[in-house]
Amino acid sequence: MRKITTAAVIALAASAVAEDLKESLAPKLQRIIGLQADVGPLHPVLQNLYPVAVVDGDRFLIFDLDESKTGYRFLKEAPVPMPMPKGVRAAFPLEALDNRSACVVSPEVFDSARGYVTIFHEFVHCRQWETVEPALKGRLSIYRQAMEAGDYMWELSYPFPYENAEFAEDYPAALDRMDRGDGPEALRIRARLKDLLGPENYEYLCWQEWKEGFARYLENAMLRHLDMEENHGGLALPLTRVAFYEGGSRFIAFLEGRENGLTLNLETLFERIADPSGEAAGNSIRPTGPSPTTH
């Protein structure tokens, strides 16, 4: 009987803590609405809001837009599908939401203005998933191979040759040429990197530049608008996957400068990243079918 009583007390205490957290989060979620009114005009993608799943131990506290779309309300609790790292900042489909994509964060993200910008970074990924990501991804040979092998974490675990000395030198060099306005030389270096990497590694590079680079591109647009320091981390040696956040962002800015309005169509943006000449990038990368836009 004592064990049952103790268990009941623990359960009640946990429930009370969860209720306190939900209550404290409610006004913080509403600030997302206010920020969107400020940053939404920067790009059509930022005009979309998505569910927010806050990690509380081994469960999600899921908030979604109310019926009026003018505020967030608590929707439900759900078990986390896998252990969540401390300070998680992510976006992925949730079974509890019938596979709708959600921003997944830990509670301290709401403690700073930059944290709210991070939420919108993750909303960009939600928009990618909601529009063209599944179709684009399905045309990548590296994705098909990963699915055949049951490797669902391939985007994080892909064995990209970051340590290759030529790549580590030329990738930042191409970005530097873009920044200096020397587009032809930047694209020559880029073409050399494509040959160096081979088809599969090049697919991975382009995928990460499109997915994470575009989110970083809009993240920095928001930070500039809010008079906050931009995020340009990722190119310090040794290079890691985060290099493609910064590299992708700068490459996208370069491409947008050559083709105004390019970022308004996510599929075309991917095509240009894969082949800046505007020609077909090869069957393994170039998507087919309709071209959903970000609107």
Label each residue range with its predicted role:
Residues 117-130:
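Active-site recognition of the HExxH zinc-binding catalytic motif
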Residues 2-9:
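Sec-dependent signal peptide recognition
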Residues 130-230, 259:
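Post-HExxH zinc-binding segment in Zn-dependent metallohydrolases
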Residues 104-119:
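Short pre-active-site segment immediately N-terminal to the catalytic Zn-binding motif
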Residues 70-99, 111:
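Catalytic zinc-binding patch centered on the HExxH motif and its immediate surroundings
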Residues 19-78, 109, 215:
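N-terminal mature-domain "stem" immediately C-terminal to a signal peptide or N-terminal signal-anchor/transmembrane
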Residues 9-18:
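Hydrophobic h-region of N-terminal signal peptides that target proteins for export
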Residues 189-295:
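Pan-zinc metallopeptidase signature
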